[in-house]
Amino acid sequence: MKRVFLVTFLVLVSTFLLGATKEIVFWHSYSTTSGEYELLTKDIIPTFEKSHPGIKVTEVQVPSDEMRRRLIVSTAAAQYPDVMRMDIIWVPQFADIGVLMPVDKEFAQDFAKLKGTFLPGPLSTNYWKGNYYGLPLDTNTRVLLWNKKLFQAAGLKQPPTTMDEFIKDIKLLTKDTNKDGQIDQWGFADNGFGPWNTIPWIYSFGGKILDDTNSKALGYVNSAQSVEALKTFKDLYQQGYMAPIGGGGIGTLEGYAEGVYAMIFEGPWAWSIIKGQYPDAEINFALVPAGKGGSKSVVGGEDIVLFKSTKYKAEAWEFAKYMTSKEVQLKFAGIGQMPVLKGLLNEPVIKNHPFFGIYLQQLETAVARSPHPAWNEINDIMDSAWQNSVVGGIDPKKALDDAAAQIEKVLKNYK
């Protein structure tokens, strides 16, 4: 009789505990063949569930090229995951339509404690109209890659640290090495005219795209500093000191590795791509040269967001916090994902890494691509303005005046 009672009791307890478990669904785009996916599914989630026995995390992998379509379908059906790893550009877009949870409002005390632990650039990508709609999860930026052999051949010992030195070195390192009358070595190369490429120029020169509230372009995108950045870039390009962009030539990473380009701006993925094709290539990193605005670069990456529709907001928040914890951030750093927390430069996994240190240092001052729901439109306007000036010959001030007017029209829809 006692045995029957005990078995019945255990069944009831198990049923109760099973019923009490709260399932949260986490969308992400980590490739199922990646180290990040293996870490997430075999370590991060199981460890979280073990320390939070009442929570079950169901991860759903959505390929990155399908994610936006899935989100749009979810919007139409009003069916969202609880938590998502979201591209930083999308956060203000989905915050603006009211589907994301303002975490600084819902979890005010927790957020106040966490806010100061994040790198400012990645954190800013979650901000829209007075609230934060997520936490930074992983990040990246662009730094200067310089070819030491080409520098030494030109009598230069160190990479440039200022914009003046940068411009001087670009000119010095552009050469016709085989004396056939054609330039075959360029001081600098890049692969586009959009803000991802040009923000290091604009902001290091002291310019901006939008004001601090992301509601005004006039006087910022066409400020004297922004115009100077475009004019400098245009002059270098038209005078032949920068490699042609979009002309079907050698790619920036290949050109850097092969000694065709002395300097490029590139992200942390450059290491694996270059080493994969050129195992013996020497790669040297430095901060973006500082101008009147300091050493500034652009922020990339993903945030972790909660949807308002979640039934388990407290549990979803616990998982989001866990994903941004020092423990988890360092685990991901160990397989190549850039962390978002301050104060990690002396951690062994960072200190002993060939390039994380310089990227984290750059991220201390890196700026987001103006967090705004209409960023894609703003991006295209800026891309066209720079391209029309650099390649098309339009005066830099006119190009940016026109861009400012176009962006102002876009911004009016969000005031």
Can you annotate each of these PLM segments?
Residues 18-99, 108-115, 158, 245-246, ...:
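Conserved N-terminal structural module of periplasmic/extracytoplasmic solute-binding proteins
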Residues 91-99, 104, 119-158, 190-215, ...:
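Periplasmic solute-binding protein
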Residues 71, 166, 173, 202, ...:
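Hydrophobic residues within well-ordered alpha-helices
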Residues 63, 88-143, 167, 183-184, ...:
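Hinge/lid segment of periplasmic solute-binding proteins
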Residues 169-174, 215-245, 288:
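Glycine-centered hinge/linker elements that transmit conformational signals in sensory
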Residues 82-85, 262-266:
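Paired acidic/hydrophobic, glycine-rich loop segments that form the ligand-binding mouth/hinge
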Residues 104-118, 178-188, 207-228, 276-277, ...:
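Short, solvent-exposed loop/beta-turn-alpha elements that line the ligand-binding surface or hinge
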Residues 108, 269-280, 291-384, 414:
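C-terminal lobe and pocket-closing loops
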